[in-house]
Amino acid sequence: MQLRLLVPRDAPGEEPLVTAERELLEETGYRARDWHVLADVFNTPGTSRERVLVFLARDLTWVPESERAGFVPRHEEAQLQLRWVPLTDVVSHFLAGDLHNGITAVGVFAVHAARQGGFTALREAVLPQR
């Protein structure tokens, strides 16, 4: 089994939330009304300044292709196969050692913990001050 979070590639000058919104639409065809930060991590602190923000997008709405601003899926985006997987199943796959992507694990376990707390501790989806 392979599972990954959407990993937006920054466009120069684009805010992280704007990038996440654009990538969600381009790669899945969905738009979200509700965005929060699940995690803010450095992959390799001490050796890299690469910062990864993991967002939670909720209240999703399907956007017909005709309304997607002319984006045409190419390369890997055209090959993506989306499916809904219950969160508890994904957690079980990580705990069983079936899944290994570190950033995806951070996101999965963060949303699992947030859901157990009723999503009350989530932060606004804005870039934290550096």
Walk through the language-model features, giving the residues of each.
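Conserved Nudix-box catalytic region and its N-terminal flanking loop in Nudix hydrolases
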Residues: M1-R22, P64, F71-E76, L80, ...
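An acidic, carboxylate-rich microenvironment
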Residues: E15-V18, D34, D89
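Recognition helices and adjacent regulatory flanks at domain boundaries
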Residues: R22-E23, Y30
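Active-site micro-motifs of SAM-dependent methyltransferase domains
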Residues: E26, W62, S92
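Helix N-cap/coil-helix junction residues
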Residues: G29-Y30, L99
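A short coil-to-beta-strand element that immediately follows conserved catalytic motifs
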Residues: R31-L38
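Nudix hydrolase/Nudix homology domain
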Residues: V37, P45-S48, L53, P73-R130
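Active-site-adjacent beta-strand/loop module that shapes the phosphate/pyrophosphate-binding cleft
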Residues: T44-S66
